[in-house]
UniProtKB/Swiss-Prot annotation:
The species this protein was found in: Nitrosococcus oceani (strain ATCC 19707 / BCRC 17464 / JCM 30415 / NCIMB 11848 / C-107)
GO BP term (any one): dUMP biosynthetic process
Catalytic activity field: dCTP + H2O + H(+) = dUTP + NH4(+)
Domain of life: Bacteria
Family named by the database record: Belongs to the dCTP deaminase family.
Gene transcribed to yield this protein: dcd
One GO molecular-function entry: dCTP deaminase activity
Record-given protein name: dCTP deaminase
Length: 188
């Protein structure tokens, strides 16, 4: 299994639509202002979060249960900035829609800009033949409110290609998050 370069990422995005919309280079500025970078990097792709957020709140004194998650535990927000309460979290989705080839597995890692502020981005691997918008989880580990910026870089996707095809892909086993298009809550 080998890590894939910027050349491979550009080719696969442009010829096979594995990332849409796709930015073939790193973008570090918008409207004459510095932003948290996104786009193609040397050995990965820096993804953006959309302006759709679900901010966790415990107004109902709920117990967090991944098998029976209470959707009313979230407040829906559409904004260019998400303010996450202290020691809480928010969900969002990527701007980019992914179509992962059968021979590829991706690992997603949070950007250091957020990590150095106590904001942790958690994303599970994108499995072979999975497709959809990626649901992002932002944990604010600080005792203060924390900002996440929409349409700017939040994490990096690193692509690994296997030397042989898997027997069963995410699509083959009808994965429960296949084709997701919005911020998707846990499914048991």
């Amino acid at each position: 299994m080998s890590i894939k370069s910027d050349k491979w990422i550009r080719y696969m995005a442009q010829a096979h639509g594995i990332i849409e919309p796709f930015e073939p280079r790193q973008i570090r500025e918008a409207n004459n202002a510095r932003i948290i970078s996104y786009g193609t990097s040397s050995y990965g792709y820096d993804i953006r979060c959309s302006n759709e957020f679900k901010i966790f709140t415990n107004i109902n004194s709920a117990v967090v249960d991944p098998k029976n998650f209470d959707a009313s535990s979230f407040v829906d927000v559409q904004s260019d900035v998400c303010i996450i309460p202290p020691n809480s979290f928010a969900l969002a989705r990527t701007v980019e829609y992914f179509r992962i080839p059968r021979s590829v597995l991706t690992i997603c890692l949070g950007k250091s800009t957020y990590a150095r502020c106590g904001i942790i981005v958690n994303i599970t691997p994108l499995e072979p033949e999975w497709e959809g918008h990626v649901t992002l989880e932002f944990s604010n580990t600080t005792p203060l409110p924390a900002k996440v910026y929409a349409n700017e870089g939040v994490a990096q996707v690193v692509f690994f290609e296997s030397d042989e095809l898997c027997e069963t892909s995410y699509r083959d086993r009808s994965g429960k998050y296949q084709g997701q298009t919005g911020v998707t809550l846990p499914k048991a």
